Structures are given as C-alpha cells and as structure tokens.
Amino acid sequence: LRYMDRYVTVKQGEVFYITEALAQVEGVERGPAGNTSLAAAFALAQTMDEDEIIVVQETEYTGAGKHPYAQLNFARENGIDVRNGDPDEEKPGESVIIPEHPEQIKARDLDLDKIKKSYLKNIVKKTEVKEINQSELEFLAEEIKKSTSEVKEIMENEFEVNVKGE
C-alpha cells in the first residue's frame, strides 16, 4: 500500500481477450494467468497521454501455461456461460464474457481507503494491540500513504487503539 496510487481489477473475459490478442499480434502463446496486469494496463493506457508511463504489478502468476481454449472449454463443461458480449455483465462463478471490441476492456478501481482500513484492522486483530506510540503511528502512516492524523483517527475511533505521545 505504501507505493500504490491505484488498485484496479479486470474481468476474466477481458483477460482472455488480451491473451488471444497477444497471441495474434506477437505470436506469443501462454495462458491468461500472466496477462491480468496486461489487460489492466491496456485499459489504463487508453486513458493516458503518449508520453506517460504505466507501472503494473502482477499479483498472481501460477506459471500454469495452459492454453486459454482449454480453460474456456473446462469452464463450459462445468456450467459456466462463456460467450462474447459486455464484460460488465460477467458474474464470477457463473459467466466469462469476452469483449467484442478492445474498447470494452475497462479497469475497475477498488477503494484503496477501504483496503487501507482493512490493513489496519488486520494489524490490530493479529497483534491484539491496545496502544501504539508515535513512531509506530508514523510507520503506519507511511505504510498506507496517509497522514498521521488520519491514521490516529482511524486507530482510535474505529479500532479503539490509543495513540500515546505526540
């Protein structure tokens, strides 16, 4: 969280679309597991100026290397609706909707503030801390890219953790 400005997700169908596009354009054949960040970068790049740089981090790579068609056939055989259409209609566990056009690929923002609060909540839960000092407060503020006053407010008001020394 310390270095994140934004956290986005994409739909499965969009990843399959990018995987196939990469195979068609570059002749690169690999499974979609490594192309999740590529799909997000593709969507974000469409909104950026030519001279801007995008940095993406793949959060999951299985190295499975499965061909995407095998995965889509497996999904179909297990009752998943696999079709072309609007990826926004995709429902996890029910459907994989592959875009009909590259413009349909979108990055969907997750609420970073919610993730940051969850991070603090997990720290409190796992450590069972009831009080933190100023240096710990400063560390947490840097860790989640918030001011010390914001972190103090969250810790005291939402998690009943006392912040001592100022």
Which stretches of residues belong to each language-model region?
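Long, compositionally biased intrinsically disordered regions
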Residues: 164-165
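Catalytic phosphate/nucleotide-handling subdomain of diverse soluble enzymes
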Residues: 39-93
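Active-site/ligand-binding loops adjacent to catalytic centers
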Residues: 1-28, 71-153, 158
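Generic beta-strand/beta-sheet core signal
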Residues: 10, 31-33, 57-59
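Flexible, glycine/charged-enriched surface loops at secondary-structure junctions
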Residues: 26-37, 50-53
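A short, acidic, amphipathic alpha-helical segment used as a generic capping/interface helix at domain edges
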Residues: 12-17, 22, 36-47
